[in-house]
């Protein structure tokens, strides 16, 4: 577990927050809990392609949209229910390292306004605390390759994809 992270395949799941059908199913934190407790190492889109197969890194997906008060996790353009981003993060924080000490990678697809993006950052900092990777790993001044799973034990990484159309629209409408 000392090679760079990208040298490992990561076992994955899709729409971890959904129970049932992806167009009309229920969104719940139970999917995250189940995945974490069964060593499911999940991703929304594609696994990390490389040489070794690793089953102890969680790669889990979160589709985040504006909520009335705080951001919500739901499947866009569908009739699925919604779950609080805070509750999803709390479930991930509670169960992330019960089965494995290796990193959890959250793949977030952001469809939120700028104010709710700020809330996402605040919620994740508050809930994940020091576990959230927010700077280069200690003693790695320049990133030529990703840290190893060993270096990332007990850490949560965030991989983000923004819906630039909604962000651009939001910025232009604020003028």
Q: Residue ranges of each PLM-predicted region?
A:
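Long, acidic (Asp/Glu-rich), low-complexity accessory segments flanking structured domains
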Residues: 1-42, 49-59, 65-175
């Amino acid at each position: 577990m000392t090679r760079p992270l990208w040298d490992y395949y990561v076992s994955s799941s899709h729409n971890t927050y959904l129970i049932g059908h992806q167009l009309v199913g229920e969104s719940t934190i139970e999917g995250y809990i189940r995945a974490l407790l069964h060593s499911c190492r999940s991703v929304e889109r594609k696994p990390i392609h490389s040489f070794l197969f690793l089953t102890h890194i969680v790669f889990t997906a979160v589709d985040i949209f504006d909520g009335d008060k705080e951001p919500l996790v739901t499947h866009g353009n569908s009739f699925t229910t919604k779950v609080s981003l805070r509750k999803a993060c709390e479930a991930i924080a509670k169960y992330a390292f019960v089965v494995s000490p290796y990193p959890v990678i959250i793949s977030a697809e952001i469809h939120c306004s700028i104010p709710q993006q700020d809330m996402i950052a605040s919620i994740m900092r508050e809930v994940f605390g020091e576990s959230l990777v927010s700077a280069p790993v200690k003693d790695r001044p320049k990133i030529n390759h990703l840290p190893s799973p060993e270096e990332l034990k007990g850490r949560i990484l965030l991989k983000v994809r923004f819906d630039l159309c909604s962000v651009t629209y939001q910025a232009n409408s604020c003028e």
